[in-house]
Structure formats: structure tokens, C-alpha cells
A protein has these predicted regions:
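A cross-family "folded-core" feature that marks the main globular domain of proteins
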Residues: 1-221
């Protein structure tokens, strides 16, 4: 987790010797860890390019980087991420307003934290695949759009459409009580988006050792 964190924030190629020194391990251990990391991130179309003696760089789509974080190392990196009291209050107000259960809110919260941290470190989503673009204008998008308008006022910077779409993924298809006025009971999403959400939930289930019943979180597609 530490190695990925350093590489994803590096503004220039990272020397293997520097990683070894920071992690307080032998160079051979670092190289072995790098090789294992390369294999893990390969399925996300992410690569660690460069050479040990000239510097290494993490290459790949920002969305895929976030997906890897959410599915694999969120707890190690963001467990105590400082959001500030005002932002936390707005998040909990959002949960209460939509009558979100703990699991559903936890899913949304993770997406939000990763989005904020990546944006504030200068790493924004420039483009998403067409299957995610279809969320634009959906109920999920409108809910997130309104919420992020409030966050913009607190943060003092603009949040792009692409970032709003990213956060919408965490809301799309979520089941809420029929009497919740601010979200439609049924949100139509594509099979691709649904598969993505289910895959991430499976990862969260494995990390937290809790059972997730898919039909409690998703509407029929």
C-alpha cells in the first residue's frame, strides 16, 4: 500500500533505492514487492514503467487508479482521512436525508474520500468510458450533483462533471425506502455499471468480513 501511495503521488520517476530507504527494507525486497505489485495492478490496465536505477512511474487512467484503491487498499490508505467537521456533517446529513443504511453509506463514503483526496493532490478524472457517461442526468447523478454543489461551497473549488459521474457510481442502483422523496426507488443503470458496483462491494465484503446481499442494495436492472 505504501509503495502504491508513493508512486501514485510522485511528480517525477521514483528511484528504487529511495523506496527501499523509506520502507527500511533491502533493495532486493523492494524489487520483489514491485514485481508483485505490477502483477496485481495489471488487470486494472496500470503499469509501473521505468528502470530501478533511473526511476519508476505509475502509468494509467486515473479512474482505474481509484478503482484499484477502492477494491484493494482503501483501509490502509484512507481509514483516518481528515475531512473536517463541516464536510463530515454534510455527509451524515446526506445519509440521513436518503435513509442510507451503514453499508450503502460506507460505499458512498469511500468513493467520496478517494475523490476528494485525489482531486486535492492534483489528480482529476478527465474522461470516463461511455458506459459511465450514461449516468449523466440520471437520478443518481442529480442526487450527487446537488450534494457536491454544497461541498463546492465549503471547499471553495469547482468539482467537474467527470468527478460527479464518478461519485454517482456509488449511488446508482442503490435501494432506498419508498417514502424517500429525494431519490427514485428505481434507478436504471447498465449491466456494466452494475457489474462494477457488485465487484467493488465484493471486495469490501472481503475486507470487512461482512455478508452483502446484493438485492438489498440494488434495484432490478
Amino acid at each position: 500500500a505504501y509503495m502504491f501511495w508513493q508512486l501514485m503521488h510522485a511528480e517525477e520517476p521514483y528511484l528504487t533505492d529511495d523506496l527501499s530507504e523509506e520502507m527500511k527494507v533491502a533493495r532486493t525486497t523492494t524489487i520483489g514487492d514491485l514485481n508483485r505489485l505490477r502483477k496485481v495492478i495489471e488487470k486494472y490496465d496500470l503499469k509501473i514503467k521505468g528502470k530501478a536505477n533511473t526511476g519508476l512511474a505509475l502509468c494509467g487512467d486515473e479512474y482505474k487508479i481509484r478503482l484499484f484503491i477502492l477494491e484493494n487498499i482503501y483501509e490502509q490508505l484512507y481509514l483516518n482521512f481528515p475531512l473536517g467537521q463541516i464536510i463530515r456533517e454534510k455527509l451524515y446529513d446526506f445519509q440521513e436525508r436518503l435513509s442510507m443504511d451503514a453499508l450503502g453509506f460506507g460505499f458512498f463514503y469511500r468513493f467520496f474520500v478517494v475523490m476528494i483526496q485525489r482531486m486535492e493532490s492534483g489528480h482529476t478524472i478527465k474522461k470516463l468510458e461511455p458506459k459511465y457517461e450514461e449516468l449523466y442526468g440520471s437520478s443518481a447523478y442529480m442526487i450527487v450533483d446537488e450534494f457536491l454543489n454544497e461541498i463546492e461551497q465549503v471547499k471553495g473549488y469547482k468539482i467537474s462533471k467527470e468527478e460527479r459521474l464518478f461519485l454517482s457510481i456509488s449511488v446508482a442502483g442503490m435501494r432506498t425506502p419508498a417514502n424517500t422523496a429525494e431519490i427514485e426507488q428505481k434507478i436504471s443503470i447498465s449491466e456494466g455499471v452494475a457489474d462494477l458496483i457488485i465487484e467493488i462491494l465484493d471486495r469490501i465484503k472481503a475486507e470487512l468480513n461482512v455478508t452483502v446481499v446484493a438485492n438489498e442494495l440494488f434495484d432490478d436492472f
